[in-house]
Amino acid sequence: MAEKKFYIQRYLKSEQGAWNADGLRKSLEDDFGGGSVRYKSLEGLNSKGKQKGVYTESYPESDALRVFVDTNARNESTNATLSVCVFGYDVDGTTELSITDQIKAAEKAWDSLYAYLECALILWYDDYRQRKALFLVQDATEPSTDNIKNIPYLLCSVKLVNVFGQSFDGDSTTIEDWLKNGGK
């Protein structure tokens, strides 16, 4: 059985208006050099945004609401928070690095990950939950430092906006079709 991972794929808008993949998809935990990024949580992945396209009217002469429900109703965007721990060495091995060098390596790995996330749409794919979602970074982030058994690491949380206001089954092509059609 293949090892399960968390993947992210960066998309940039072309001059023609389509969203194109910027390179290959990356493993969140394996592809950001300098240190080791470890997934902690993604809060809000399964949240569903308020349904748009539903309208009600109330009249004094009626006991019931007049209701309109668009058959193509969509969800408002939702918020999610991706939290990762970034270590300054390969956590699967041993380290001979000084504390200062470990912190520098952790900062390098964090900078690499954050540069990949910002200024683009990010397709998240989660092997564990078999879910995918389309995110963008909209808020500032401030990593904090901490120690586990005298090993320094960065705790980094990134606030994301879920473009569709929901996640999709891993086999769905809804997001990819939307990206190819320029966000339509």
Language model features: what each stretch is:
Residues 2-184:
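Extracellular/virion structural assembly segments
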